[in-house]
């Protein structure tokens, strides 16, 4: 694609810039890991998106951060593997496929399991193709030769092996437990699939009569229909109000069942009446209480949310219909004494919207405590631990690991990894294995599939060839270097990958975890369908381009923080790219057919040349350091300031002097510096804005095929000149001050005015005299005087800069009162700066701990502010003469 035409198109058009480039990168195989043993490997596995539809802004943000990391490392000489893949997303995908079938008047049961799975695979193929297209639009440098899917054979083999090994170790078991149950889809749900909503409900206050006829005990519930499964009433053992009742029984209203009054510390004495009904089959806390007291578990609902035969006369009713009828009956019986309105949080299925039912069910579980112990212990080993960025999320992770519950891993679905367990048709014997029993005709396989998170937990190593530990990719690229993900799935995914990685590979699955927040709208609200505030990243790309979206997403927040998405800010980024484009056009038009090998930085340089090269060095150092710390926002801001302010607004303007002059040697040096600085800047910017940087770089004199594999910039000490940088800062301060004064008195730059500069000493005088051509070019004086012993002219506008005072005698334009007010404001500013720096230097803690260079820097600031303050005071005194 090499294109060293000197002219870019006149206008920046993101559509034409981005068109075709991604395909060109893929054809060049620039994103494929090479396996080159001379290079250090660097690995990231993409958090696999669900094959359920379009990618959202959160995906765009998450993958952009990964792309920035991998593009940077590739340019730094690493053998980079960024492995793509997708998740089968059990319930989410099955719900989508079932929804599509319903539109055709078909249920999954009409099709049967095999035919339904064919439909699910068709869905997967269609939406996987959409996702790849979206990845391409964002510009993600993925190694598609290694793409994986959680239901691929290799990954399925890994899942079965892990299940069997955990089962053989006694870490997977089958038992009864309270799970989140979705009556609409008839499956267990993980906590992340439950959305909690504030709902207007009620406390139903009831009197349960003591069986001996001596009175009653009052309690309240928000789910009266579950009372049909009550097997006890509980009070706190130290509650003096009820101590005398412990061991007695009450008669369950309507049902007539005699149930005990028990004592348990689970009960809060000060909440409500201090009495709670215990329904072990319909509440997780009650289940635990029931286990402690050996209470029976009475399940009163069917899987579809209807009441079963244990509910007596309410058998067959929907649970909410039962609630209405039961409340009427309780009122008629005189048991229900009050209905108190109550707003409370109720779990709803993320997929079906149905109210989730805590439900007793026989499921498969992972025994978590032994696995979590190893993961917690790992964090005590400084060299082996997983590093969380920001660090505070390590505590979040550890808190959860230290208070972990067993994990329900079975789901009543068809789409997913079918549990590798079989039941003997005659004996009921359970067989668990990676292969089916030899006499398969005598066995029935478990109908359930595994929780999607079970296979996702193996993602960092199953994608690299495990359980074949001799796999070339597994040996070279595991463990991975970084995981980029949101804080909302630390528990559900990050923690599980860590303990499974430790259990089956003996290593952490990744060295670093970079945590980001959620994408919110400009008002800070979570994006959702109900609010109608969601934004499709493809729409953003169409309007402003992937580069603009990527730069905003990657620089718009700090690690761990939420991101407020703003189209206005994306537009501002587009304007920034447009400025880069125009600056690049200027550079290219002045290259005079220069070849890469003709770039020569050894010629005599102006102060502006030395300054821009020094600033480039500083920017390279800042960007590289911040990238290493995952501070993409800071890195991006360093680049933005350098490109917009230093390169475009100052250096390019100053470069016009030699470019349009007669000195051929100066022209050549300036062209070389323009080409070099733009080349290095495009490389630094490339991970953020891959498309436009490739386009510009291809037009620049360059070597190599693509910027994607060009070397990352490094600081060049031979181009560092801090003295020249200080000289340039003085020039910039003078030019800015003159422009500000002219603006205050409405004197356009085109109008020539007399200008006088009083240099602090001979050294400053020499600097300013040497660089006077810049002052004349950018300040447009009719006459320029630079001396060390100047007297301030009467009625002159004044500015104070480090090392000099400026005077613009604008007698006819000055309002003395306004000038006095302006100087008093300046004096106030310098008073505050002097106070601030002196306070810092008088702080013994600061002086004792700060590096000597920092303290010296503060003392230099103090001296500078004192001199500026004195100059302003003198000027105010002159005005009073």
UniProtKB/Swiss-Prot annotation:
UniProt keyword terms in alphabetical order: Aminoacyl-tRNA synthetase, ATP-binding, Coiled coil, Cytoplasm, Ligase, Nucleotide-binding, Protein biosynthesis
Molecular function terms, GO-annotated: aminoacyl-tRNA deacylase activity; ATP binding; valine-tRNA ligase activity
Coiled-coil region list: 810-881
GO cellular component terms, semicolon-separated: cytosol
Localization terms from the record: Cytoplasm
GO biological process: valyl-tRNA aminoacylation
Substrates-to-products reaction catalysed: tRNA(Val) + L-valine + ATP = L-valyl-tRNA(Val) + AMP + diphosphate
SUPFAM superfamilies in the cross-refs: Anticodon-binding domain of a subclass of class I aminoacyl-tRNA synthetases, Nucleotidylyl transferase, tRNA-binding arm, ValRS/IleRS/LeuRS editing domain
Motif position, 'HIGH' region: 49-59
Pfam family membership, one: tRNA-synt_1
InterPro entries reported in the protein's UniProt record: aa-tRNA-synth_I_CS, aa-tRNA-synth_Ia, Anticodon_Ia_Val, M/V/L/I-tRNA-synth_anticd-bd, Rossmann-like_a/b/a_fold, tRNA-bd_arm, tRNAsynth_Ia_anticodon-bd, Val-tRNA_synth_C_sf
Record-linked PANTHER family: VALINE--TRNA LIGASE, CHLOROPLASTIC_MITOCHONDRIAL 2 (PTHR11946:SF93), VALYL-TRNA SYNTHETASES (PTHR11946)
Oligomer and partners: Monomer.
NCBIfam families: PRK05729.1 (NF004349), valS (TIGR00422)
Written domain comment of the UniProt record: ValRS has two distinct active sites: one for aminoacylation and one for editing. The misactivated threonine is translocated from the active site to the editing site.
Function text: Catalyzes the attachment of valine to tRNA(Val). As ValRS can inadvertently accommodate and process structurally similar amino acids such as threonine, to avoid such errors, it has a 'posttransfer' editing activity that hydrolyzes mischarged Thr-tRNA(Val) in a tRNA-dependent manner.
Protein name: Valine--tRNA ligase
Naturally occurring in which organism (per UniProt): Bacillus cereus (strain ATCC 14579 / DSM 31 / CCUG 7414 / JCM 2152 / NBRC 15305 / NCIMB 9373 / NCTC 2599 / NRRL B-3711)
Gene field: valS
């Amino acid at each position: 694609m090499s294109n060293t035409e000197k002219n870019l198109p006149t206008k920046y058009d993101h559509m034409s810039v981005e068109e075709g480039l991604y395909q060109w990168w893929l054809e060049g195989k620039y994103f494929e890991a090479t396996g080159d043993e001379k290079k250090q490997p660097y690995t990231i596995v993409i958090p696999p998106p669900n094959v359920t539809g379009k990618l959202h802004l959160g995906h765009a943000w998450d993958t952009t951060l990964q792309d920035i990391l991998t593009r940077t490392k590739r340019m730094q000489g690493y053998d980079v593997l960024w492995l793509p893949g997708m998740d089968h997303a059990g319930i989410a995908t099955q719900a989508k496929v079932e929804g599509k079938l319903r539109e055709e008047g078909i249920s999954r049961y009409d099709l049967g399991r095999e035919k339904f799975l064919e439909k699910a695979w068709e869905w997967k193929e269609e939406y996987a193709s959409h996702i790849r297209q979206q990845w391409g639009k964002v510009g993600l440098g993925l190694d598609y030769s290694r793409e994986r899917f959680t239901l691929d054979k290799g990954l399925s083999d890994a899942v079965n092996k892990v299940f069997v090994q955990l089962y053989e170790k006694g870490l997977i078991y089958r038992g009864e437990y309270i799970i989140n149950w979705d009556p609409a889809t008839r499956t267990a749900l993980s906590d992340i699939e439950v959305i909690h909503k504030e709902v207007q409900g009620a406390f139903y206050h009831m009197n349960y009569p003591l069986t001996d006829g001596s009175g009653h005990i009052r309690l309240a519930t928000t789910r009266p229909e579950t009372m049909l499964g009550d097997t006890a009433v509980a009070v706190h053992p130290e509650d003096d109000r009820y101590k005398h009742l412990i061991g007695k029984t009450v008669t369950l209203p309507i049902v007539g069942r005699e149930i005990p009054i028990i004592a348990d510390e689970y009960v809060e004495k000060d909440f409500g009446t201090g009495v709670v009904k215990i329904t072990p089959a319909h509440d997780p806390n009650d289940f635990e209480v029931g286990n402690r007291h050996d209470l029976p578990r009475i399940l009163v609902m069917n899987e579809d949310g209807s009441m079963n035969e244990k509910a007596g006369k309410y058998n067959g009713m929907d649970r909410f219909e039962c609630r209405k009828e039961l409340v009427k009956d309780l009122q008629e019986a005189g048991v229900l004494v009050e209905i108190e309105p109550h707003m409370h949080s109720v779990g709803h299925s993320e997929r079906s919207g149905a109210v989730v039912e805590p439900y007793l069910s026989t499921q498969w579980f992972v025994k978590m405590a032994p696995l979590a112990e190893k993961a917690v212990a790992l964090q005590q080993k400084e060299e082996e631990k997983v590093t969380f960025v920001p660090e505070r999320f390590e505590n979040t992770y550890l808190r959860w690991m230290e208070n972990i519950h067993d994990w329900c891993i079975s789901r009543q679905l068809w789409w997913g990894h079918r549990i590798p367990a079989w039941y003997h048709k005659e004996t009921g014997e359970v067989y668990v294995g990676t292969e089916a029993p030899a006499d398969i005709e005598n066995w029935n396989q478990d109908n359930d599939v595994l929780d999607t998170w079970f296979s996702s937990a193996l993602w960092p190593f199953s994608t690299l060839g495990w359980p074949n530990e001799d796999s070339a990719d597994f040996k070279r690229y595991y463990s991975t270097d970084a995981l980029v993900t949101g804080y909302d799935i630390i528990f559900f995914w990050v923690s599980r990958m860590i303990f499974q990685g430790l259990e089956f590979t003996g290593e952490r699955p990744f060295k670093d975890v970079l945590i980001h927040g959620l994408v919110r709208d400009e008002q800070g609200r979570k994006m959702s369908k109900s609010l109608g505030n969601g934004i499709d990243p493809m729409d953003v790309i169409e309007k402003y381009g992937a580069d603009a979206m990527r730069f905003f997403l990657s620089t718009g927040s700090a690690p761990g923080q939420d991101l407020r998405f703003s189209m206005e800010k994306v537009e501002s980024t587009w304007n920034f790219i447009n400025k880069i484009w125009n600056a690049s056009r200027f550079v290219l038009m002045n290259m005079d057919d220069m070849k890469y090998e003709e770039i020569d930085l050894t010629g005599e340089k102006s102060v502006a040349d030395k300054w821009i090269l020094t600033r480039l060095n500083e920017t390279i150092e800042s960007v590289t350091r911040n990238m290493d710390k995952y501070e993409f926002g800071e890195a991006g801001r360093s680049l933005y300031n350098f490109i917009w302010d230093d390169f475009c607004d100052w250096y390019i303007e100053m470069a016009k002097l030699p470019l349009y002059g007669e000195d051929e040697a100066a022209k050549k040096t300036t062209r070389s510096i323009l080409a070099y600085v733009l080349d290095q800047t495009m490389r630094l910017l490339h991970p953020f804005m891959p498309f436009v940087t490739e386009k510009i770089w291809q037009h620049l004199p360059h070597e190599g095929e693509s910027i994607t594999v060009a070397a990352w910039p490094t600081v060049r000490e031979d181009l560092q000149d801090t003295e020249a940088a200080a000289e340039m800062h003085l020039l910039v301060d003078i030019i800015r001050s003159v422009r500000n004064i002219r603006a205050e008195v409405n004197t356009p730059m085109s109008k020539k005015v007399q200008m006088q500069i009083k240099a602090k000493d001979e050294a400053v005088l020499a600097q300013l005299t040497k660089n006077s051509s810049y002052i004349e070019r950018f300040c447009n004086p009719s006459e320029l005087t630079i001396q060390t012993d100047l007297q301030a002219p009467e009625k002159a506008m004044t500015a104070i800069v480090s090392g000099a005072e400026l005077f613009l005698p604008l007698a006819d334009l000055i309002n003395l009162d306004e000038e006095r007010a302006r100087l008093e404001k300046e004096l106030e500013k310098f008073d505050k700066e002097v106070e601030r720096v002196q306070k810092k230097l008088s702080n013994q803690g600061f002086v004792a701990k700060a590096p000597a260079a920092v303290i010296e820097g503060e003392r230099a600031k103090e001296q500078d502010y004192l001199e500026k303050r004195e100059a302003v005071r003198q000027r105010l005194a002159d005005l009073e003469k």
